[in-house]
């Protein structure tokens, strides 16, 4: 039995609220159970130096957690004077994942920054950031099209992400913090709407996982991501 009482392949309640803030070209509050993340998409003209003159755009991401998003207060990274390794790893993952959704040539020489701010953490913050970040990105692309900054929408794939793991010997979907902190294996899976894998990050905690467990985790991930993509589409078509 999972601590939450959910079935092995059951997602936490998922809610995606668009237009959560008024200034950004795209903004979303994503709630995955008790994990809550604000994702905003900001469009600026121009690209990083390494892309100048190449006729393509860029998508990057930043990630952070509010000091009391967790059980005990943590210092802001700005107060420490540098980002931690975990933060850098997560924002690179978000950026890579969302670039896989876009034809960067069609974006032109524009840069979109996805800011992911965790206001409450209960497991799965990086996957929630990717899922919510995609919706914010899609809204930003609509703004570019409406303002005739691009000729056509550069999005070519829908992207979503989920955490899976092995908990008490069973592959389970969408780990919350009590499960994540006690899982034998935890894995993050990012997929597109064509059934392709963008990235898989998996780690065994103390004991190696088997082929059977691997296939079980991927099976529940596929099911969960299909449901998440339905929620993304429902949010995007809700005017």
Swiss-Prot record:
The keyword Secreted does not apply. It holds the Pfam family RNase_PH_C. It is an enzyme of class 2 (transferase). GO terms for biological process: rRNA catabolic process; rRNA processing; tRNA processing. Belongs to the RNase PH family. Phosphorolytic 3'-5' exoribonuclease that plays an important role in tRNA 3'-end maturation. Removes nucleotide residues following the 3'-CCA terminus of tRNAs; can also add nucleotides to the ends of RNA molecules by using nucleoside diphosphates as substrates, but this may not be physiologically important. Probably plays a role in initiation of 16S rRNA degradation (leading to ribosome degradation) during starvation. This is Ribonuclease PH. It comes from Marinomonas sp. (strain MWYL1).
